[in-house]
Amino acid sequence: MPPMAMNMAVRAALDEMLRRDDNVVVFGEDVGFFGGVFRCTDGLQARYGMHRVFDTPIAEGGIIGVAVGMGAYGLRPVPEIQFADYVYPGLDQLFSEAARLRYRSGAEFVAPMTVRMPCGGGIHGGQTHSQSPESLFTHVCGLKTVMPSNPYDAKGLLIAAIEDDDPVIFLEPKRLYSGPFDGHHDRPTVAWSNHPLGEVPDGYYRIPLGQAAIRRAGGDVTVLVYGTMVHVAEAAAAETGIDAEIIDLRTLLPLDTDAIEASVRKTGRCVIVHEATRTSGFGAELMAIVQERCFFQLEAPVERVTGWDTPYPHAQEWDYFPGPGRVGAALRRVMEA
């Protein structure tokens, strides 16, 4: 299996599905001739033609609306929103049309579309290029939401998303495109070629949606994470010496609640980490699930480590970003409770 950066794993998944299924089409701002701002579609237009990989105007509502119509008529569109921060003009088409089409038509029509969005901070993108809006999508019935943490998962989950008959939001942490970033911004970037999950098989494979992965087994505390925070949590556990069990959710909807429950019942403690703002973040839903299912097994209050309730600051990016120091402090608190 060749080592592969995460953006190239995304490209490999798109390449595989374009080759296997003539109904797959890929489009968005700069995804055609230019190959995407993060190179995730590099060379695909030259290989498959302008009718299957093409550029669009800067009109997110139009991009998503076109995808809904394509899906209803049998295609499998994979539109890209250049940054997750730009999706807001397209939310009406996404929430009112794509998410509800199956329900509204009695399943006569579906919207088998996968909307790719680079998300998250850590690249000095400021408030308009750093947001993590996953909780917007998990609140809407009819959408599935995925956020991979490594190249191997990115390819397998994206293939599964494209094959799904319902709309999937595929969030790609852009700080992970080049390597497994653990929050230590003052250290040299590690390449995916030095990480076991940077090895990506050639050809077709899929990872079913709704299955979490245990990245680190442990008995002291459960850490629920996804995306970039998987690597931050691993660093925090290593630096504190706490025997943490790290659960990479991978898919936020459908959510692997059985894996969450099994781990928390075992450890009796739970820390939840995400990069998005704290209030009404997805961590609040995870906390509710843990309290409902594992209340009598808990030996300490559930902790959340998140971004702050502010727009993503440019100059104070690393004060906002939940790094291993903040995560490690939360791990110590639940162990001392």
Model-inferred region functions:
Residues 1-167, 171-178, ...:
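Thiamine diphosphate
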